[in-house]
Amino acid sequence: MISFVFPGQGSQRIGMGEDLFGRYPELTAKADHILGYSIQELCRDGERLNQTQFTQPALYVVNALSYLKKTEETGLKPDFTAGHSLGEYNALYASGAFDFEEGLQLVKKRGELMSRAKGGGMAAVIGLTHEQVTDVLRENHLDMIDIANMNTPQQIVISGYKEDIEKAASVFEAVNGVKMVHRLNVSGAFHSRYMLEAKEEFSRFIESFHFKPLSIPVISNVTARPYEQRELKETLTGQITGSVNWTDSIRFLMGRKNMSFEEIGPGKVLTGLIQRITAEAEPITDEIKVPAEAGKSSITAASLGNEEFKRDYQLKYAYLAGGMYRGISSKEMVVKLAEKGMMGFFGTGGLNIAHVEDAILSIQHELRDGGSFGINVVHNMKHTDSEEKMIDLLLKHGIQNLEASAFLTVTPALVRFRAKGLKRGAGGQIIARQRIIAKLSRPEVAEAFLSPAPDHILQKLAAENKITAEEASLMREIPVAHDICVEADSGGHTDGGVAYSLMPAIIRLRDDMMKKYRYGKTVRIGAAGGIGTPEAAMAAFMLGADFIVTGSINQCTVEAATSGLVKDLLQQMNVQDTAYAPAGDMFESGSKVQVLKKGLFFPTRASKLHELYQRHRSIEEIDEKTLRQIEEKYFKASVSSIYDKVKAHYSNEDISKAERNPKEKMALIFKWYFRQSSASAIKGDPDAKVDFQIHCGPALGAFNQWVKGTELESWKNRHADGIGMRLMEETASLLNQKLGSFLQTC
């Protein structure tokens, strides 16, 4: 077994963390934002580095980054963690009690409060045991002195007013057996009764934080035993005035089987202390108390999914909301999700560049203080120039997260997006600013995105000066996709895949590709399609999903940019109320989309148009009765008037092709119906209701049944962020129940 131990104040040194800040630029930037100054500059500033309000945040950050580096390089997770004073916050961070930012906020406040303490002093008495030091204090009526630290069996730190410490130091220097009395360079009486005011203010501050269940036992400085979840806040707050019982903490860990220790952070102060303790003291063999409720609360909404994924995307939850065409996944939806620690993708399909740019600027303004979001880009096989323009726009505005949908292969535009800004970090790792989450459902497509970019594309982009030679070189060492989203049967474009088959296959493919190309960073695999209930989300995580992506359920929320009439229809649907219909944007190929069918004629009429397209070479070949039905029932206008609208919509080049090819002309006329059916639905035109094209999967039907009889039964009470949090919380609860039941039967 192994314990990771984290040092506290006194271990700081000038230049610490220099090899870490470049390796973790996003966390370093977060630290700078929280602290209001550069953490890297602080660690170079010897004067500030020795001031409590700066020392503690600096050590916390360096310890935390050291831990991440250690786990990433070795894959090693400790069996226990402990930290000396300030270092205990890193032990709790490693155990998952809070994330990096929350821990830094706590440490910043702690350092500020402790730095206010004036007139105090501390001294280390070396050569006497805790009992002997206590006897000397009592015999000499030094009752204003507290024991602050028990660092080793014979290194005891005392704390109190400066004049009392001076008096006590003189007494101890005359005591037989004392090897040295070392006065510490501090201004406060830390870990003593004199920190009560700081403790009380910190107690009020910590109240607003929600600590997650510990995934690794953490040894408390105060009790020298593992933290109990229900007493976490009280124990951590009590550390400010309580003694740091480091000796018994290590003795307790020594009592576990074959325990080894590794110090994580700057210096080797704790390593030296542990060597003294193991040489001078016996192990404590108390049994570890496991709280009865621990099994019931081991999994939380925030602990679901891959931790590195959440850290990379700066998320609290491993929960994404996929892009929906024509901006149905609206800017309002994206902002709502970001504010709650989730991520949504603005849907650009069917929108012009100006509309998308306005949305990006609006979202960036709303999230100027933080929050992650992305842009969904749908592949357009016929108009790759529009894809290039979209990538230009995303790069122009510094968009980092792209959800790639309906791509059957890797395109130059995607490669260019991924390549821009690539650089090699100080530790040799490749730092990718732009991230692509490839949404796919076929292994051959996954293989393309899990491979480095094709060399011919890189050479062409470099020759055209669209990427640099260095960017092209680095692209040969990383996959095109930062992460993969495996899309099972879903609303909209779908291959009708089955998650139980797809997820294991793609995960194994990912593992094979990781070995083949020896990538330095794992590609995470997420799950989408059919996720609308806790049971479905649980199944996704149990299949190995690092994150989940919802879609259909978000279309029936207040934030969805579609009509109330559509939401009324969606609210009433059940799992059987969908059908497959031809996709308007891929009409000629026969690709399918899944749509709502209950009370609508669109699925039938769309299929009829595609059947006619397949059977006839031109619209003139269609018999008069059928053509009249199309004009009166489908188009509610003559074919000639529809073609006039088509000519106004498409480019001269497209119309020229249509004039030369009657079948192409027929396709453009029929595709007008698909565009109009979507536009009418979004607008909420009651006269065109039966022709509404509403992309949707069975997940929403399952969701409707789940929330039936609750306040969420009405879409007017459904908000994308609230749905996301509720789904994750209920999934965590369900997992705990199922695991508990499973363990009881074993």
UniProtKB/Swiss-Prot annotation:
Enzyme superclass (EC): transferase
GO terms under biological process: antibiotic biosynthetic process; fatty acid biosynthetic process
Residue segments, region Acyl transferase: 1-312
EC identifiers of the protein: 2.3.1.39
An annotated Gene Ontology molecular function: [acyl-carrier-protein] S-malonyltransferase activity
Any coiled-coil regions, as ranges: none
A GO cellular component annotation in the UniProt record: cytosol
Reaction catalyzed: holo-[ACP] + malonyl-CoA = malonyl-[ACP] + CoA
Pfam families linked: Acyl_transf_1 (PF00698), FabD_helical_ins (PF21607)
Pathway annotation from the record: Antibiotic biosynthesis; bacillaene biosynthesis
Keyword Transferase: yes
Catalytic site: S85, H191
Sorted UniProt keywords: Acyltransferase, Antibiotic biosynthesis, Cytoplasm, Transferase
Keyword Transcription regulation: no
Family: In the N-terminal section; belongs to the FabD family.
Protein's job: Probably involved in some intermediate steps for the synthesis of the antibiotic polyketide bacillaene which is involved in secondary metabolism. Probably has an acyl transferase activity and could also have a flavin mononucleotide-dependent oxidoreductase activity.
Protein name (database record): Polyketide biosynthesis protein BaeE
